[in-house]
Amino acid sequence: MNWITNYVRPKINSILGRREIPENLWIKDPTSGEMIFHKDLEANQFVAPNSGYHMRISAKNRLVHFFDDGVYTALENPKVVTDPLKFRDEKRYIDRLKDYRSKLGVDDNILSARGTIEGLPIIATVQDFAFMGGSLGMASGEAIVKAFDTAIAEKCPLVLFAASGGARMQEGTLSLMQMPRTTVAIEMLKEAKLPYIVVLTNPTTGGVTASYAMLGDIHIAEPGAMIGFAGPRVIQQTIRETLPEGFQSSEYLLEHGMIDMVVSRLEMKTTIARLLRLMMKRPAVVTPSPPSPTDSQTSLSKTKAA
């Protein structure tokens, strides 16, 4: 059937003037099976409208929805040595990086930016799980440290959206070194008395959980996010016991006091803005109520009614 698909069908389409339908126009909700039009899903921040299931969202899309009017200024990530260990598994590490960079159009998995949320200036840092599983390496470590340095220099709070499978094995000890480096950067932010809020997204595991993802002043998680150090399968094989249902889910961690709150992505901006105002002792934003009708307007409406 390949000759029909590869030759006959395109020929017929070209004669009849039919256009090829792009893939992924409709995206399936994995919980309900509902098919959602991709533009509707993007407008809803990749949250399924009926089930509330939180799908993965790119770093750029997250920042567009997070900052006021979708306006932000990206911070340039520092340059680092590529593939210092000349690592190779099934594929050369440097080739793997080239593939991801070509596919996603970014150098690594960290995107940091400055902007405002409800008028408050902040620095936001987002890990993109699509780039090598959000793994923590030299490039991402340097980018995170720069974001903290920028927040301190500009006297802004920092909000970090974590999404990672852990340390990047292709960089060995150089990857693990980013854990204490980011920890020091956090301490410097706290010494400057600036807030640090962490949003834990699905998944947040490994060395990221063991470092900057769990050192915030406030920890917020998205619904249904998996958060932990080792994965549940590894733990179960190690201790040879059945784990509780929903173990490592954001709701389970909230119930057991590991995080402060679980917040929908649709309410994240408002929630974080409110928290930052409390932490920085800024006045609350008061939404003006609609003006009440004047006496003359009231009497006029009564006259018309009569």
Curated annotation (Swiss-Prot):
Domain annotation CoA carboxyltransferase N-terminal: ranges: 25-294
Primary subcellular site in the record, as a coarse category: cytoplasm
Region (Disordered) residue spans: 284-306
Record field: transmembrane: none
GO biological process, one term: malonyl-CoA biosynthetic process
Top enzyme category: transferase
Compartments reported by the entry: Cytoplasm
Signal peptide: none
InterPro entries: AcCoA_carboxyl_beta, Acetyl_CoA_COase_Trfase_b_su, ClpP/crotonase-like_dom_sf, COA_CT_N
Catalysis: reaction(s): N(6)-carboxybiotinyl-L-lysyl-[protein] + acetyl-CoA = N(6)-biotinyl-L-lysyl-[protein] + malonyl-CoA
Disulfide bonds: none
Keywords: ATP-binding, Cytoplasm, Fatty acid biosynthesis, Fatty acid metabolism, Lipid biosynthesis, Lipid metabolism, Nucleotide-binding, Transferase
UniProt cross-references to Gene3D superfamilies, sorted A to Z: 2-enoyl-CoA Hydratase, Chain A, domain 1 (3.90.226.10)
Biological pathway: Lipid metabolism; malonyl-CoA biosynthesis; malonyl-CoA from acetyl-CoA: step 1/1
Gene Ontology molecular function: any one: acetyl-CoA carboxylase activity
SUPFAM superfamilies found in the cross-reference section: ClpP/crotonase
Subunit field text: Acetyl-CoA carboxylase is a heterohexamer composed of biotin carboxyl carrier protein (AccB), biotin carboxylase (AccC) and two subunits each of ACCase subunit alpha (AccA) and ACCase subunit beta (AccD).
Family: Belongs to the AccD/PCCB family.
Annotated function: Component of the acetyl coenzyme A carboxylase (ACC) complex. Biotin carboxylase (BC) catalyzes the carboxylation of biotin on its carrier protein (BCCP) and then the CO(2) group is transferred by the transcarboxylase to acetyl-CoA to form malonyl-CoA.
Name of the protein: Acetyl-coenzyme A carboxylase carboxyl transferase subunit beta
Species the sequence originates in: Bartonella tribocorum (strain CIP 105476 / IBS 506)
